[in-house]
Amino acid sequence: MRNIPVADVEDLDRAVLAIGTDYPPQHVLAFHEHRRAQVLYAATGVMRVETAEGAWTVPTARAVLIPPRTPHRVTMTGVSTRSLYIEPAAAPWFPPRCRVVDVSALLRALLLDAVDMEPRYPEHGRDATVVSLILHELRNLTPLPLDVPLPSDPGLRRLCEAFLRAPDIHDPPGRWATALSVSERTLGRLFHRETGMSFKRWRQRACIVHSLQQMPAGVPVTRLAATLGYDNPAAFTAAFKKVLGRPPTAFTTAGRPGPDT
């Protein structure tokens, strides 16, 4: 199925539904939720998925797992998606929180095949086997640390959201502590309690995740490093590898599979 609303088919009696959708540039899907679990795969472009818990960046050729009944907003940058909508009973192992994952070559091929299946595919035969393989393959995907958790504390959340709009790797914790009228030590405890991360680690991940949103536009590493406040491109690349375990080139056109169809 391609370019049809999931609401038109969501109640079909099939464990998995696959839909391919093309979106205009800078398209935003306002907050919504699905009865089914969703696997949202970026065939092209980059997505940013937001929930009350945080924000997840999804580079090209990766996917985000979205639990059922999870309100979320999606910002699209040059995106064509391949989505799976899965009955919760068919995937009891599905994570309770959004998760960005690497997509194996096998799952990618299965996704491309599934979107061209009939909505009410036969429950026995080739298409049912494709669905069964998809469910098996989904269980073993490698998570990527591309989430930026957001605190529930209103004051700290406002500061975090402002930082995400204009991240700076050298933004000092003292500025945040002053804004909240607390000591830096108290800020550190609050940050860890609210996000599960230290201030320094959260700041670095936020910067690296932000850089991924710029890569599809061809922004060079030198400019990304300067914009984020890194001393030089080498420092940015080292930080990138520390967070994601691979260099920026792994997330650019040269490091991705060919275009999906």
Q: Residues of each region from the PLM?
A:
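Alpha-helical residues within the helix-turn-helix
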Residues: 178, 189, 193, 226-227, ...
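Amphipathic alpha-helical segments enriched in hydrophobic/aromatic residues interleaved with Lys/Arg
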Residues: 92-165
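Generic protein-terminus/edge-of-domain signal
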Residues: 1-46
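Short hydrophobic/aromatic patch on the recognition helix
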Residues: 61, 187, 191, 235-236, ...
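Short acidic-glycine-tyrosine-enriched beta hairpin
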Residues: 53-68
